[in-house]
Amino acid sequence: MSEKVIVEPTPEQFGIFWKYLSRPEVTDVDYNGKKLWITDLEQGRYCADEEIPEAFISTFTHSISNCINKQFNNANKILEADTKELRISIIHESAAISGISICIRKSPCFVRNTLKELLDQKYCEQKVLHLLLNCVQAGMNFVFGGEPGAGKTESAKFFMQFIRKEERVITIEDSLEIHYTNINPGADAVELRVGKGFDYTDAIKASLRQNPSWLMLSEARSVEVTSLLEQWSTGVHGFTTIHLDDVRKLPDRILNMENRIYRYVNVAVLIRKTESSDGKVRRYIDQLCFFSRENAENKIYMIVEDGALVSGKIPLDIQKRFNEAGVDEPFVCRHFDRYLREGR
């Protein structure tokens, strides 16, 4: 569990790292004890042509440990900290035999893309965007899957901005990445951070007494999934992310809860990241499905497969949700043109 850095990062504190962290397209800065590796939305992952002095690394780690008042040495091998937009993880050289390891991940307080940019990037077909926007309007429960670094959280953040401001949203995270009050300014929101003495299960149970319309869990892991599905079963809506390589595997990823998945998870979206031979990175919606439990049978309706719209068949219970929300045509979002004009 990371500790929050009290002060905001400065160019002086982050030194060589800041040169890359200050670039909007950079998402990760990783140092493996010898080389500096950069993950860039446009250029992909590359080794930076930088010499990293040992003195700088020593000064940097000492600065971070002071900020969170935590020792970093042979006896305390892990140092983790957050700023408002950075998540920092450091492993001591006594454990990392290749040399001290530093990973810095950026989590910006804004949505990286607009609807127009997603269409230009071929993130998904326009009909799929319409469908997902209508799913938000209808209060569906979403699970965003993908491999680490695929862009699950960024995709979830993008669709969260379309939740109506009067609907109370509670976010639950260990490292602050969603920044809901920033991406949906003026909305009724409560942002919870779990830690010692207040774990995910505690936060989820406490949230139910806070009159939420939506309950957002940054990442679904182990025991907290049970509590999350229990809350979703009460009529609270929500988003979460999970490590996954196929939406059809979701029921198997969450043990002993197969029927609840089909009953209380409505939409699963798989985000895929690919890299071309010239190093260009592309992220896109590879799969989209609806889960449904019909006549005591569990069913999966694949809507998008291999990045292409393959079916327009909507389960009856999902169609009912659309109808109750005033959505007559699931693949046509009546607010889409307005969202485009607003630059969302």
Q: Which positions does each model-derived feature cover?
A:
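Phosphate-binding/switch region of NTP-binding enzymes
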Residues: 259-295
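NTP-binding/hydrolysis catalytic cores, primarily Walker-type P-loop NTPases
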Residues: 1-16, 284-344
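Hydrophobic anchor at the beta1->P-loop junction of P-loop NTPases
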Residues: 144-146
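Conserved lysine of the Walker
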Residues: 152
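P-loop NTP-binding catalytic core
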Residues: 37-138
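Phosphate-interacting basic helix/loop segments used at nucleotide- and nucleic-acid interfaces
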Residues: 4-27, 68-75
